[in-house]
């Protein structure tokens, strides 16, 4: 991480604490019950390190810990986490729209830069780029849950039925290898995809701008799509 001061309107806190708060918010949005093991997996740190970090966050009034070990964001912690996701979103857009960086690279760069953004620079980015526009991965500024995606008429590519056309709307952005894998197969935000066949193991055969490609379930479950024909159905 950058050795630079962090900026937020609630607390002056360390980069590490900001990372934990954002990880909790993102894990919650995906429907996970956030416990120490969840955070250890998300942040790739040891369980003892998580225990110490959560203890400090609780002392600072940024999280609550239930009797069963579930970690929840307190109001102050949620405010910081949401602010950080907005900055992350703006930096991703800046890197792609102004500097022309490839969509599958911007997440990692934004992770490094988001902690060093001042309120003034954030305001200038917002004025320059505008609001209400998806990031290069197709995701909205606010962290969305699976339910909120579905309310917008989206469903997972893994649920699309053969014989129909869909358009990629958003992609899970935390896995760089996945993003590069999808880019090689021309599965990117805005791309049109024809679902040709579902194999016995649920692997999908797709037609994209890259030609005929195969996509496993684990990857297809990270891609949100919308229908391109009125009769398109999805599996429950």
Predicted segment positions?
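Short alpha-helical segments that sit at the start of domains
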Residues: 2-21
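Basic amphipathic alpha-helical segments that dock to polyanions
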Residues: 20, 50-60
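Short acidic, hydrophobic short linear motifs in intrinsically disordered regions
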Residues: 30-40
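A short, conserved structural fragment
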Residues: 58-68
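Basic, amphipathic "hinge/linker" alpha-helix immediately C-terminal to the N-terminal HTH DNA-binding motif
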Residues: 69-88
């Amino acid at each position: 991480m950058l050795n630079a001061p962090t900026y937020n309107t609630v607390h002056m806190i360390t980069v590490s604490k900001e990372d934990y708060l954002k990880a909790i918010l993102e894990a919650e949005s995906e429907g996970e019950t956030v416990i120490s093991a969840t955070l250890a997996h998300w942040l790739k740190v040891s369980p003892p390190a998580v225990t110490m970090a959560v203890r400090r966050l609780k002392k600072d009034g940024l999280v609550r810990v239930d009797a069963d070990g579930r970690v929840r964001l307190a109001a102050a912690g949620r405010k910081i986490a949401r602010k950080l996701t907005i900055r992350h979103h703006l930096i991703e857009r800046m890197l792609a729209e102004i500097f022309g960086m490839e969509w599958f690279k911007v997440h990692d760069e934004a992770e490094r830069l988001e902690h060093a953004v001042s309120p003034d620079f954030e305001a200038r980015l917002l004025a320059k780029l505008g609001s209400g526009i998806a990031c290069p991965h197709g995701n909205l500024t606010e962290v969305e849950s699976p339910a909120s995606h579905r309310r917008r008429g989206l469903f997972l590519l893994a649920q699309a039925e053969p014989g129909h056309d869909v358009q990629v709307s958003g992609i899970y952005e935390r896995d760089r290898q996945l993003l590069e894998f999808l880019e090689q197969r021309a599965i990117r935000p805005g791309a049109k995809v024809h679902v040709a066949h579902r194999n016995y193991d649920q692997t999908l055969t797709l037609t994209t701008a890259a030609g005929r490609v195969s996509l496993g379930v684990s990857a297809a479950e990270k891609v949100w799509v919308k229908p391109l024909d009125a009769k398109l159905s999805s599996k429950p």
